[in-house]
Amino acid sequence: MLFDWRNIYRRTLPSKWRYRMGIYGRDVIRDTWMLGFQNAVTLLTGLLAREQRLGQLTLPNYSAPVWFRLGTADAFVVRQVFTVQQYAPLTQISNVKFIIDCGGNIGCSALYFMKHFPDAELVAIEPQRDNADLFRQNLLSFSSRVHLIEAAIWSRETELYFRNSNAATSSYEVAEVGESEVIKTVTLANMEISQDRHP
């Protein structure tokens, strides 16, 4: 007698769990296809981890590993850039010489751009120190073409107070006064960026 696994699956799991398993199942298959089995396991571990620790991925066609924090939003950022490839439409643009990355995070988008635009230079702005440290580590092999400014983009130059609202390392609450980490700001107009002169 053959088991009807679909019926067992439908009867034993509530619909919300079936939905979640379907979503994660598709994501894991896509991660495995795009990144390889070991990287997909590491990425899934990063998504499910309850405590923060450092992990690395060795991506196909990238010479150095990509470092990220397991148990934070870093794994979602890695997935968006390297598996979902949200920036792929931009690679159709030709003759790119200069890129500004406002919110460099841990450097995934910058790494993607450096790979796809080999003649471009990039200036990234990232206010959070832990993110900036990982950014530098991830972009070490492109250090001659990448410039990092540890500041926040704002409408005027001032000091802001950043507070991390949760384990998401890509979102922060911002105020001009407060008791959290003090971050200096820059404006695009005051950065005086040109292709010949970088800050």
Each predicted region: which residue ranges?
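Phosphate/nucleotide-binding beta-alpha loop and adjacent structural elements of enzyme active sites
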Residues: 1-199
